């Protein structure tokens, strides 16, 4: 017999509102009901949509793209790996990959040498330089600037991807947390301005990762699958604190070009991202790993990309060739209600934002070329 319970009797009060008891759902105002059969787990419930709409599967980018958020890792260290990368990029119409693997010194020189030795890839891959933020204290800045100069001389075209560990976990020599806007780091950002190279920085993680892991958290499944992505407030600074430090750094260095990776983790709040871009003309942003937010608000995303078309770069993050076409489909079509490629990121569907060609060209390649002088033309 189906269990129908009165919300007046068994409701759970949440402030001025009420909610059905666990294991039930509201089927009519004031009535909660449990399923006939035991419900599946969130992992096993995979409903198939019956919606019939036009579908346009976009296998290659409409214009030759620059992936500014590449992580090819070991693929760029050998002739065989570069050949594998070559075939994958050609199949996607990705003209250039920027390796944002935070390498420096000998590792960077080895990567650049391998790339330059490849006739097929010497004009297809560029490398960003890493910064070692460990042991910040007296004398650190001078050494870091010297290493950065050497890395740029060796072929680096920018700095990055600066890891989220800056701000979250790295400690200074005195044991205190290294804040993103620490004055000790100013010489590095000033040197980037002098060299005319951009800084590609990943700050914090999605806001949800800093919230309680309960059944109201949109990223509950991801945080259960990857518990290391949780940032409880008793161990880490808050999301808001990290964003404040990041923005302070951006403001302090108006001559330095910064690229906020992952749309600054503001793709779920485009008004906040727009306010940041309005306030700081030296800041750009990049779309890697936030397609799930871009594609669930197609009208707002379309308008945002139109307004800030000169400030957005294309990037993918994790190098999985099969996932790039989802970006192309969102950016280039008006398709409705289609799957995202990682269910644990998002249990919702995506919509195309149908960007005009003039904007696609800027996002795919022109903006990256504008701010990164070392990229192949």
Annotate the PLM regions:
Residues 42, 110-229:
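Active-site gating/metal-coordination segments in enzymes
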Residues 14-22:
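Boundary at the C-terminal end of the N-terminal hydrophobic targeting segment
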Residues 57-60, 85-91, 111-125, 146-156, ...:
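Acidic (Asp/Glu)-rich catalytic clusters
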Residues 32-120:
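An N-terminally biased module of ancient metal coordination in phosphate/nucleic-acid-related enzymes
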Residues 73-81, 100-110, 134-142, 169, ...:
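Acidic-and-aromatic substrate-binding clefts and catalytic sites of carbohydrate-active enzymes
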Residues 234-377:
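H/E-rich (His + Asp/Glu) clusters that bind or coordinate divalent metals
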Residues 64-70, 96-99, 125-130, 159-161, ...:
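Hydrophobic faces of well-ordered beta-strands that scaffold small-molecule active sites
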Residues 25-27:
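Extracellular, cysteine-rich, disulfide-stabilized repeat modules with beta-strand cores
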């Amino acid at each position: 017999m189906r269990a129908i319970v009165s919300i007046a009797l068994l409701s759970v009060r949440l402030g001025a509102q009420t909610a059905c008891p666990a294991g039930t759902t509201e089927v009519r105002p004031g009535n909660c009901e449990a399923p006939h059969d035991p419900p599946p787990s969130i992992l096993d419930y995979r409903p198939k949509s019956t919606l019939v709409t036009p579908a346009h599967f976009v296998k290659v980018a409409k214009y030759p793209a620059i992936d500014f958020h590449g992580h090819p890792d070991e693929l760029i260290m050998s002739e065989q790996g570069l050949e594998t990368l070559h075939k994958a990029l050609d199949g996607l119409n990705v003209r250039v990959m920027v390796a944002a693997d935070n390498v420096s010194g000998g590792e960077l020189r080895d990567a650049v040498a391998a790339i330059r030795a490849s006739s097929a890839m010497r004009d297809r891959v560029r490398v960003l330089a890493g910064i070692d933020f460990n042991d910040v204290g007296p004398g650190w800045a001078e050494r870091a600037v010297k290493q950065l100069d050497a890395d740029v001389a060796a072929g680096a075209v920018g700095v990055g991807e600066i890891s989220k560990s800056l701000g979250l976990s790295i400690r200074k020599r005195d044991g205190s947390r290294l804040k993103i806007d620490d004055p000790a780091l100013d010489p590095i950002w000033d040197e980037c301005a002098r060299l005319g190279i951009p800084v590609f920085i990943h700050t914090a993680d999605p806001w949800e990762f800093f919230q309680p892991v309960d059944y109201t958290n949109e990223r509950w499944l991801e945080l259960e699958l990857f518990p290391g992505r949780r940032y409880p407030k008793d161990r880490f600074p808050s999301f808001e604190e990290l964003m404040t430090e990041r923005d302070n750094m951006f403001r302090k260095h108006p001559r330095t070009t910064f690229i906020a990776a992952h749309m600054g983790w503001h793709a779920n709040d485009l008004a906040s991202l727009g306010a940041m871009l309005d306030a700081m003309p030296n800041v750009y942003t990049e779309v890697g790993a936030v397609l799930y937010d871009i594609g669930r608000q197609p009208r707002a995303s379309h308008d945002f990309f139109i307004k800030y078309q000169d400030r957005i770069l294309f990037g993918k993050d994790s190098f999985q060739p099969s996932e790039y076409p989802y970006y192309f489909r969102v950016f280039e079509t008006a398709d409705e209600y289609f799957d995202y490629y990682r269910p644990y990121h998002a249990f919702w569907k995506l919509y195309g934002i149908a960007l005009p060609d003039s904007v696609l060209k800027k996002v795919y390649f022109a903006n990256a070329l504008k701010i990164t002088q070392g990229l192949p033309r």
